[in-house]
Amino acid sequence: MLSGLPGSGKSTLARRMSDHTGAILLRIDVFEQDLRNANGDTFDVGTQGYQIGYDLARHHLLKGKDVIADAVNAVEPARTGWRAIAEETGTQIIEIEVVCTNEDEAAQRLRTRETGIDGLLPVMPQDRRKRIWEPNSLSSGTVDTAGRPISDCVDDLLRLVKQTG
């Protein structure tokens, strides 16, 4: 499970990890935007995007596939959902926080990124700063992407997964 604020680099890392390992990538932004596309831009997705992610994770894990959950996971209830799926399916969960400690760099990423998701509006830098973030006492580690090549960050992520798994 990769957690982090918008602009931290978690989706980029999740894609690279999926490409490297063959794990199924579950990106909550996709599910949430699909719900908005189907129900209108003002539709309040609430926790429904996460519920879709949990259901898909369960499905793939029961088939013996590895899964990468790419979501903000800013609060404990979101993380608890992923943990419950891991417990239910008898699989291990590895929780890693992705951060960008350089706020200017994170803001630049948000201003210039291509989401690859039809209809998804960009997160504004000021909205990133307003986000609630609850510390995760069960995190296996943190990858700071600030000022670093993505390949180095992927290497750090792979090391954390190997150490924990």
Question: Residue ranges of each PLM-predicted region?
Answer:
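Glycine-rich phosphate-binding loop used to anchor ATP phosphates in small-molecule kinases
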Residues: 48-93
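Hydrophobic anchor at the beta1->P-loop junction of P-loop NTPases
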Residues: 2
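Conserved substrate/cofactor phosphate-moiety recognition/catalytic segment
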Residues: 8, 12-65
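Small-molecule kinase domains that catalyze NTP-dependent phosphoryl transfer to phosphate-bearing small molecules
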Residues: 115-156, 163-165
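Conserved phosphate-donor/acceptor-positioning beta-strand/loop module used by diverse small-molecule
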Residues: 89-110
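Conserved nucleotide-binding/hydrolysis micro-motifs of P-loop NTPases
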Residues: 30-32, 99-105, 149
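P-loop (Walker A) phosphate-binding loop of NTP-binding proteins
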Residues: 5
